[in-house]
Amino acid sequence: MHCERFLCVLRIIGTTLFGVSLLLGITAAYIVGYQFIQTDNYYFSFGLYGAFLASHLIIQSLFAFLEHRKMKKSLETPIKLNKTVALCIAAYQEDPDYLRKCLQSVKRLTYPGIKVVMVIDGNSDDDLYMMDIFSEVMGRDKSVTYIWKNNFHERGPGETEESHKESSQHVTQLVLSNKSICIMQKWGGKREVMYTAFRALGRSVDYVQVCDSDTMLDPASSVEMVKVLEEDPMVGGVGGDVQILNKYDSWISFLSSVRYWMAFNIERACQSYFGCVQCISGPLGMYRNSLLHEFVEDWYNQEFMGNQCSFGDDRHLTNRVLSLGYATKYTARSKCLTETPIEYLRWLNQQTRWSKSYFREWLYNAMWFHKHHLWMTYEAVITGFFPFFLIATVIQLFYRGKIWNILLFLLTVQLVGLIKSSFASCLRGNIVMVFMSLYSVLYMSSLLPAKMFAIATINKAGWGTSGRKTIVVNFIGLIPVSVWFTILLGGVIFTIYKESKKPFSESKQTVLIVGTLIYACYWVVLLTLYVVLINKCGRRKKGQQYDMVLDV
């Protein structure tokens, strides 16, 4: 016992020193600005900080590639499908078409004897359509529905403590005794909905799969995640490959689709290699039920800065698994399609909410670095502090008073984006990933200020995005973007003022003209490809129905 505690203390000290040293090293490299290569007049330079970031991308891509090779080898491993699985679907003001597609895909799941529990967040007349769709798709004679005035933590109007207890027991009994059930309950947020499913199931099943009501599951999705959990008893949770269902509906949903592929098949695949996936996404994830019930109460009652948390449910669920020392994995063999916002403002609000949960969970996650591979500490430091270094770099370049610095920054952003997207195109075997380089502009212009706004408002709760049946536009997300554009515009004006005081040399004019032409050509080529290959092909494809969720 004493030896274990001593080793634990050593690991805590070691990971802390490693993380602090890494951060100090990156900061020193950034401040010193040592250059390996630089041209006359500093038109181009490549320094220590840039070399570090380039190395990170290469190493991350390498481990992602190795993890994908391991996934392919696992196909040869036979397993017995004798473990019990329950699928929990969280629904809130869902678009009827998406919900119907979700439930139809659930009926096609190939895992034998899977139990389906759908919990609707809200029990008003306006929510009844979701229960009707459930009965229609799952079969009125094969499913059970129940309208609950309460939820496990709040009583409905006219309910007593005794009647609340009785109704809670009734809900639990309904879930345990039926293979397919839909419950409408008093509104309480997504975490309340998930808690109802977990609590009612108890320890009656081996694995619990989670799913959102806008998700289309691949028939083999459950089987593939069970394989991962069966192969290693120290894996506590696993997530699958989440792709975009409505990627051709707008430019924002299309760019989100290529970003999703990169996030799952590069970033999370790399994390999976070391057994420390930091977020098992809500549309497609599976957990060991025995672990789930070790922390479900603490997970539900999570507080931050004195307020109960009502977002970041999936990320905190993942962190709870990691806190117990169990690994979390990703498998590209399990797939699904899910809805993403098609309007810029709704997308911005979604990203702000996700950023809030990321930074909040970063602090919680840091307490368990010592229980996992050093890669978990390394990546947390890199991804957690990168936005701050990036903002400092942008402001510095925009206020140096040189037009070339601004142009070089724009060119560098697209060059890095092209390099990453080219590798992704090779790994995926699909040229469409080249459009990932366009997402870098969206990141710099919108996601970066949204992250800062998320930190400033991190204790503000709420769903963040509205239900899909009725889209509510929230303009609050434009505030940080407007402030950011004002800062950048100020830098451009300052630079023009400084440059206007002295004539351009012939070499400087040549460099600026060539750089501008390259940047303009990049946009002309990419936008032309988007219009020709995506818009036209998309109109034909987005109306198709898929029996299998394929990488299309």
UniProtKB/Swiss-Prot annotation:
Q: Where in the cell is it found?
A: Cell membrane; Endoplasmic reticulum membrane; Vesicle; Golgi apparatus membrane
Which InterPro entries did the record assign?
Glyco_trans_2-like, Nucleotide-diphossugar_trans
Spell out the post-translational modification annotation for this entry. Phosphorylation at Thr-328 is essential for hyaluronan synthase activity.
The covalently linked position for Glycyl lysine isopeptide (Lys-Gly) (interchain with G-Cter in ubiquitin), per the record, is K190
Q: Which residues lie on this side of the membrane: Extracellular?
A: 33-45, 396-402, 451-475, 532-552
Chain positions with Phosphothreonine modification: T110, T328
Which membrane topology describes this protein?
Answer: Multi-pass membrane protein
**Which Gene3D superfamilies does this entry report, sorted A to Z?**
Spore Coat Polysaccharide Biosynthesis Protein SpsA, Chain A (3.90.550.10)
* SUPFAM superfamilies associated with the record: Nucleotide-diphospho-sugar transferases
Entry's CDD domains? GT2_HAS
The membrane-spanning stretches of this chain are 12-32, 46-66, 375-395, 403-423, 430-450, 476-496, 511-531
Q: How does it assemble?
A: Homodimer; dimerization promotes enzymatic activity. Forms heterodimer with HAS3. Forms heterodimer with HAS1.
Entry's family note: Belongs to the NodC/HAS family.
Cited function: Catalyzes the addition of GlcNAc or GlcUA monosaccharides to the nascent hyaluronan polymer. Therefore, it is essential to hyaluronan synthesis a major component of most extracellular matrices that has a structural role in tissues architectures and regulates cell adhesion, migration and differentiation. This is one of three isoenzymes responsible for cellular hyaluronan synthesis and it is particularly responsible for the synthesis of high molecular mass hyaluronan.
**Name the record gives this protein:** Hyaluronan synthase 2
The gene name on file is: Has2
